[in-house]
Swiss-Prot record:
One Pfam family, short name: UPF0231
Name the record gives this protein: UPF0231 protein VIBHAR_03438
Natural source organism: Vibrio campbellii (strain ATCC BAA-1116)
Domain of life: Bacteria
HAMAP family in the cross-refs: UPF0231
């Protein structure tokens, strides 16, 4: 997973761009976590729990996007896709679904979080 951090110094805003197929990870980091040190600490605690209990699923539910860690796999998914019932969707929505969920290895995810902290000087 490739990513880039962008700082708008005039507006004091921070942006995350992730490689194709991982856009939702950037949206999650930017919208759900942002610059909040408490939320970043919460993500780090979840990662620690995942390393301590890799056979369990660890979840951080956000307002629109959630994070799940199971073993060495990280899944970031829009909450709208987490419904327990299946809805028949037309094929033109498949591309949208692909942008609404992404997975990566836990090591890549840890690198993303550490570099985000460094970028924000937290």
């Amino acid at each position: 997973m490739e990513f880039e951090f962008i700082r708008n110094t005039l507006m004091g805003e921070y942006y995350v761009k992730c490689s194709m197929g991982h856009e939702i990870v950037g949206r999650w980091l930017q919208e759900e976590i942002g610059k909040d040190p408490a939320k970043i600490a919460q993500v780090e605690a979840l990662i620690d729990q995942a390393f301590s209990s890799p056979s369990q699923e660890h979840r951080l539910t956000g307002a629109e996007i959630s994070l799940m860690i199971h073993g060495d796999e990280v899944l970031v998914q829009e909450n709208a896709l987490g419904h327990e019932y299946e809805v028949e969707m037309e094929s033109e929505f498949d591309f949208y679904d692909a942008e609404s969920t992404a997975s990566c290895g836990i090591e890549d995810f840890c690198t993303l979080i550490e570099q985000w902290k460094d970028f924000l000087n937290i």
